[in-house]
Amino acid sequence: GSAPPGDPVEGKHLFHTICILCHTDIKGRNKVGPSLYGVVGRHSGIEPGYNYSEANIKSGIVWTPDVLFKYIEHPQKIVPGTKMGYPGQPDPQKRADIIAYLETLK
């Protein structure tokens, strides 16, 4: 299904309680996972200074809101072999909120 409207304020809270374990929202600052600053609209596997999995590099994905909505639900299903260990967020509203926040990071 398609994403419900997201709330970037709630998304920021979710990012800073869930995503922050492996990612940052700061340009150029990678952790276990790559920085998600500017991720919306970016091609997968290209954040400088991050050692991506071959699966992510070769996926050919562009991180549109729709793709992120599906990926955050089932990362391993969308990019089999991804290093992302997060099992996924089943709640569509939480996914939409996180994406709404990611869209503000530019």
Swiss-Prot record:
One MF annotation (Gene Ontology) recorded for this entry: metal ion binding
Database matches in SUPFAM superfamilies: Cytochrome c (SSF46626)
Modification(s) after translation: Binds 1 heme c group covalently per subunit.
BP term (GO), one: photosynthesis
Key words of the record: Electron transport, Heme, Iron, Metal-binding, Photosynthesis, Transport
Annotated positions binding heme c: C19, C22, H23, M84
Transmembrane segments: none
Domain of life (superkingdom): Bacteria
Family indicated by similarity: Belongs to the cytochrome c family.
Descriptive protein name: Cytochrome c2
Source organism per UniProt: Rhodopila globiformis (Rhodopseudomonas globiformis)
